[in-house]
Curated annotation (Swiss-Prot):
Protein name as annotated: Acylphosphatase
Highest taxon of source: Bacteria
The UniProt record lists the keyword Hydrolase: yes
Phylogenetic classification of the source organism: Bacteria, Pseudomonadati, Pseudomonadota, Gammaproteobacteria, Chromatiales
Record gene name: acyP
NCBIfam families assigned: PRK14451.1
Catalytic residues (positions): 19, 37
Keywords from the named record: Hydrolase
Pfam families per record: Acylphosphatase (PF00708)
Family in the record: Belongs to the acylphosphatase family.
Reaction(s) the record says it catalyses: an acyl phosphate + H2O = a carboxylate + phosphate + H(+)
Length: 89
């Protein structure tokens, strides 16, 4: 079943290759969507794909890349049209 989740990741998540690493992991898992920095220092990600793959990526977001220090990941289910790829915005 295809699911779509919007995530807000807080902590030391900008300037640590978080977006590029998220894209790499998403592509590895077959998840589509996007990831971007927010002005308040958080990272926002939209994840769409098979529920199992999206859950795996959500779990990975709690760790992130080596230099990241994630303190919180908030997520909510959203409904949007199908996305074809994963991009860094």
């Amino acid at each position: 079943m295809v699911t779509c989740v919007r995530c807000l990741i807080a902590g030391r998540v900008q300037g640590v290759w978080f977006r590029a690493s998220t894209k790499e992991k998403a592509m590895e898992l077959g998840v589509r969507g996007w990831v971007r920095n927010l002005p308040d220092g958080r990272v926002e990600a939209l994840l769409q794909g098979e529920a199992e793959a999206v859950e795996a990526l959500k779990k990975w977001l709690w760790r992130g890349p080596t230099l990241a220090q994630v303190v919180d990941v908030q997520s909510e289910m959203v409904e949007i049209p199908e996305i074809q790829m994963f991009e860094v915005r």
